[in-house]
C-alpha cells in the first residue's frame, strides 16, 4: 500500500470521537493531520495555510461543510484544494449535493478505513508535497 508520509491533511468534524478516529487512521498511514472541531476554526486555519487535502463533515453547527467548502473555494489557491465530504447521509442526492457544493468526493459514516485511505491516497498522490 502506498504511504501518505508527509501529506498534510486537515480533518474537520464536530464529533471528537470521529476526529480522533480519522486522525488515527491517517496518521497510521504517515500523514500529518491537523484537526478542527468546527468549520469556523477550519476556515481560520485554511486562511493561513492550505493543506494537501481537506476532509470535512457536512453536518456541523453554526457553519456546515457546504458553506465551508464554498468559502474555501474563494481563497487564493482554494479552488484547487482536494476536499472530501463526510456525512451520515448515504442517498445519491446527498452525494450529488456534496459534489455540486464544491467537494471533490464523498464518504459516508461510519467511515470504511480502506475506502478513506484509498480516496486520500488518490487525491494526495495526485498533488505531491512539492506541487
Curated annotation (Swiss-Prot):
Q: Which residues carry this modification: 4-aspartylphosphate?
A: 57
Q: Which CDD domains match?
A: REC_2_DhkD-like (cd17580)
One Pfam family from the record:
Response_reg
Tell me yes or no: is Transcription among this UniProt entry's keywords.
Answer: yes
One GO term under biological process is: phosphorelay signal transduction system
* Superkingdom assignment: Bacteria
- Which keywords does this Swiss-Prot/TrEMBL entry list? Phosphoprotein, Transcription, Transcription regulation, Two-component regulatory system
Q: Where is the Response regulatory domain?
A: 8-124
Output this protein's name. Uncharacterized 14.6 kDa protein in sodA1 3'region
Presence of the UniProt keyword Zinc in the record: no
